[in-house]
């Protein structure tokens, strides 16, 4: 992987990630394909929304179908027939989401398989091996996603262990002869001094890109913005910056304003299945009765298949009847909305008009522009 930085506007960056499997224009949003599919979508449909890279879930694909089935096909690209690059998370977040059925040690994490209850162990080395078999174009280190809230002492211990795991991840990645990219993950909760230690330690190990982890886990938005403002300038400028698990459209806008290049989140697909649809002027809850006889498109400014062909009334009807097509059409729209938003941000950065774009984005939704505390 090669990262090319074209231009900046304030702290916002316009560039691209170059892979053997294709080019990803940044800032970029990655749809989430947890089980080897972006829910309800064919790879061709995902590509048609403008997505150039997707995310796969190491933890879930390891448990089912497993490494051996994956290797029978070649790798995850061959298994799911996605031709572009794939980033896989390390499995850490899912393991730590298991709560009481997992035990963290210096060696790794002991837990019970949520499918059948069998005892399982996952550590940095195993995570690197699974992601190698998946053929991931971007591999994420195995870390502990520090929960929120966490006091300073716990966050410090967690961050320090994640640094040790980062070195173990790097060593195993290299010993496998993996020629793809490996990203480090910055931890430290909402504490700037701990984030400083994490960034410094990861940069000393050396990675192809750096993710900001442990945000969007329940902390106030002001804390997320503050940490991004503090951390991003410390990440080497020639490396991509990835904000994990984020987020709402406004979170993408605020991340880009602070220097983030990559995002992923289940929100556009999950919300689509629940009838929450993102449009230029905010959010449409399509199951509300007021849409029953509305013959207008979901978003007059959207060029997606759904908006070009169907009315709000039809989407409302499909939702009320619990038709699978409704979830699919909603997903096509939400994914396209996110990709149109990213394309708009990229164009605004190129033209040096990012703040004008941001102002219009919020004005259309009747909301104030959040403060930006950067030099």
Swiss-Prot record:
Region (RNA binding): 245-251, 269-273
Pfam families (UniProt xref): TGT
Amino acids binding substrate: 89-93, 143, 187, 214
Residues that span the membrane, as ranges: none
Pathway: tRNA modification; tRNA-queuosine biosynthesis
Keywords: Glycosyltransferase, Metal-binding, Queuosine biosynthesis, Transferase, tRNA processing, Zinc
The reaction(s) this protein catalyses: 7-aminomethyl-7-carbaguanine + guanosine(34) in tRNA = 7-aminomethyl-7-carbaguanosine(34) in tRNA + guanine
Lineage: superkingdom: Bacteria
InterPro entries: ArchSynthase1/Queuine_TRR, TGT, TGT-like_sf, tRNA_ribo_trans-like
Cofactors (names): Zn(2+)
Gene Ontology molecular functions: metal ion binding; tRNA-guanosine(34) queuine transglycosylase activity
GO cellular component: cytoplasm; cytosol
One GO BP annotation of this record: tRNA wobble guanine modification
Cofactor binding summary note: Binds 1 zinc ion per subunit.
EC number: 2.4.2.29
Amino-acid positions noted as binding Zn(2+) in the UniProt annotation, renumbered to this chain: 302, 304, 307, 333
Active site feature: 89, 264
Protein family per UniProt: Belongs to the queuine tRNA-ribosyltransferase family.
Quaternary structure note: Homodimer. Within each dimer, one monomer is responsible for RNA recognition and catalysis, while the other monomer binds to the replacement base PreQ1.
Purpose of the protein: Catalyzes the base-exchange of a guanine (G) residue with the queuine precursor 7-aminomethyl-7-deazaguanine (PreQ1) at position 34 (anticodon wobble position) in tRNAs with GU(N) anticodons (tRNA-Asp, -Asn, -His and -Tyr). Catalysis occurs through a double-displacement mechanism. The nucleophile active site attacks the C1' of nucleotide 34 to detach the guanine base from the RNA, forming a covalent enzyme-RNA intermediate. The proton acceptor active site deprotonates the incoming PreQ1, allowing a nucleophilic attack on the C1' of the ribose to form the product.
Designated name of the protein: Queuine tRNA-ribosyltransferase
